Amino acid sequence: MRFAYSWLMDHLDTEWSASAVADELSRLGIEAELLHEGQDPAPFVVARVGAVKPHPSADKLKVCEVFDGADHMQVVCGASNVREGMLSVLARCGAVMPNGGPTIVEAVLRGVKSHGMLCSADELGVQGWRAQDSGILDLPSSDYEVGDSFFLSGAVIEVGVTPNRGDCLGLRGIARELVAAGVGALRPLPVADLEVFGRSPIEAEMRSAGVLMGRYIKSIKNTGDSPRWIKDRLISAGVKTISCVVDIVNYVMLVLNRPMHVYDADKIQGGKLVVGASSNTDFHALDGKKYTLSKDNLVVTDGAGVVHCIAGVIGSALSGCTLDSENIFLESAWYDPVDIAMSARKLKLSTDSSCRFERFTDPGCVKLGLDFASHMIVKYCGGVASDVVACGETPFSEGRVISFNPDSVGVIGSVEIEREEILRILTALGFDVNADKDRQWEVSVPSWRLADVRSSFDVVEEVLRMHGYDKVQEQPVVPCIAGPNGCNYDEKLSLIMLSAGLTEVVTWSFMSGAVAEKLGYSIEDLCVENPVSNKFDVMRPSLLPNLLQTAASNQACGCESVAIFELGEVYRFLDESERSICGVRSGDNVPRNPHGATRKFDFFDAKCDVLQVLTQLGIDGRLVEFRSCDRSYMHPARSADVYFRDILCGYVGELHPDLIGFFEMRSAAACFEIFLSRIPNVDDNPTGDEFLVHKYQPVKRDFAFVLDQGVQSQALVDVVGCIPGVAEVSVFDFYCGDNIPEGKVSIAVAVVMISKVGTMTESEIKDVSERIIALVAQKLGGELRAD
């Protein structure tokens, strides 16, 4: 919405400049931009046409002498209605025509110089001048003087109003905000008492949620031009002028954020207007288009059932107010925002009226808007008004009272504000405050703020907003996991993952409930009350689903190999979360090259990532157990739960093959997730083996053991690794087949032996080897493979 600064001054008594007012609005949370400060001299001025002569080289052109109040100049004009003595609008050289038009320059037209251009209504982007559908504007001398700026002079401010602040879609609301911030005082609204003739011949009935008030005004004259000051203000707001009555209604809408509709009363049958649900019928609207209505549309019908208006959206061409209308019915209403939003979206139609009703209009302003508009119509169009017709009620008839503790401002906002200042701010914003009790105030919400002020938290927000968000101290959004010396593990874990070739991503804290259920999660306690869409209707119970979708999206864009991770919160309930780190690898681990074959990411890549994470957290990898898991979304034979000290800390493995297609991934995915909040205190555990340079030569030996298939390779590594003299143990082969009994498996390990006192002798090597074989037999029931 945009408006002239001088128009705002009709409602705000202040000495602040336009630039300062725009800056203050932005500080208050209403985005404001100063479009321009006004130009001097004005680019579009009222000018008088002097002598008019035929063009020497063109029959349809005329050479005019024009006076703009300062200079006489020659202008070539092709309008058929140009004549000596008329007042019109001159676009001076340098003027930029509205709506993206050209810049006016000095030109030579068929051999004759032209210093500017005389303008038509269409060229200026305005309407409402009678009998001027073609030709240049013929301005009435009673309203305009030569040399005046045609458009309202001075600065123009444009504001971007958020959906929750519909009250600021009117200049009165903007002025009210500025007054609360200490920018001047609010001027009174000029509404005088009306002389009425009695009861309206048209009654009203409300069959839906809402309130309708109206007045019958008879014997008006709508054939004259609107007063210039109304036209100027509408033009500054980008609203085209139509007729005096319609201009007044639009003017009141922009001042009070009170959309209204005017009916030609002579077209209403049965002496009655009824607001209710529509039936399936065609509707010819004021915009010249035909719409098919349904039960989702709220409409206004007459006593004969004829639809005269889509309530809160647009009127009918059948009963719209025209220049010939003599008797009108003026409607001012409050409709449920949900009803209007549903109706407008069903028709794929958005109007100034529907945008305002959707964002909530002030239910306490229905009669004020009706009185204001009625007063102006009678003043400028004549006629006599009836008594007010009223029906229906709003859900806010009892108002809203909020229990508010003023101490909560300091607790929530981390800023100290005196109680007297809190009381001043709330009172200035229109809240009625009962501060008799020391700790709990009773705060009555003004009618224009009923849409967005619903709880004590909203009251705190209002206080902080007016006090200044720049005075609120910064607080950490998410607490970081800190080590024993205060080190930031989040940062360290990110660096470890980055060094392992994974890229960090950030996904939504929401996800699709259907996807969560597909992975076997219960979403009953995770549903969002008012989701953005059905793709984000639950809080995420795991980081994995969103990462899989991210990986699939990257593969769909041509990135065949993906390795990503995320650190974030996962939820067990809406108010209970825990910290987690999750990673996904999919595609080729080794890209195509001339030196060897490629390899896909698998279980062991993800397992390596898990061990790196746990090692960074101070956990000895030898104390980590990988136990079989039965997670429905993981591969049944290539996945494991991760345990430390018998505490389930996460899981690792390959994604179930059925889900590869579900997520539309192009290859198998290896993934892991570690729940960091479950990791116990690990201060007493080593963060890794100390790196030593050995003086003596190591000895390498390979051992192949036949073990039960249920024995994990890690168990074999742990048993062999605990023997003195053994420095390193690694698995290099698995085998099931010929010469291996049924139910058995051959696991081969490479063992590095080192002595700290000297080079190992054959007898020492033999002694360590025999101890390895004996301990494996004792602990695991394994036998050294013979062949």
UniProtKB/Swiss-Prot annotation:
The entry sums up its family as follows:
Belongs to the phenylalanyl-tRNA synthetase beta subunit family. Type 1 subfamily.
Q: Which residues form the B5 domain?
A: 397-474
**Quaternary assembly:** Tetramer of two alpha and two beta subunits.
Q: Which PANTHER family match?
A: PHENYLALANINE--TRNA LIGASE BETA SUBUNIT, PHENYLALANYL-TRNA SYNTHETASE BETA CHAIN AND LEUCINE-RICH REPEAT-CONTAINING PROTEIN 47
**How and how many cofactors are bound, per the record note?**
Binds 2 magnesium ions per tetramer.
FDX-ACB domain: which residues?
694-785
Main EC class of this protein?
Answer: ligase
**Official protein name in the record:** Phenylalanine--tRNA ligase beta subunit
GO BP: phenylalanyl-tRNA aminoacylation
Can you tell me which residues bind Mg(2+)? D452, D458, E461, E462
Q: What is its EC number?
A: 6.1.1.20
Which compartments is it annotated to reside in? Cytoplasm
Reactions listed under catalytic activity: tRNA(Phe) + L-phenylalanine + ATP = L-phenylalanyl-tRNA(Phe) + AMP + diphosphate + H(+)
Per the database record, which ranges form the tRNA-binding domain?
A: 38-151
Organism of origin is Anaplasma marginale (strain St. Maries)
Write one Gene Ontology MF term. tRNA binding
Keywords assigned = Aminoacyl-tRNA synthetase, ATP-binding, Cytoplasm, Ligase, Magnesium, Metal-binding, Nucleotide-binding, Protein biosynthesis, RNA-binding, tRNA-binding
Q: Which residues form the signal peptide?
A: none
Superkingdom of the source species: Bacteria
Q: Which Pfam families match?
A: B3_4 (PF03483), B5 (PF03484), FDX-ACB (PF03147), tRNA_bind (PF01588), tRNA_synthFbeta (PF17759)
Extract one GO cellular component term from the record. Answer: phenylalanine-tRNA ligase complex
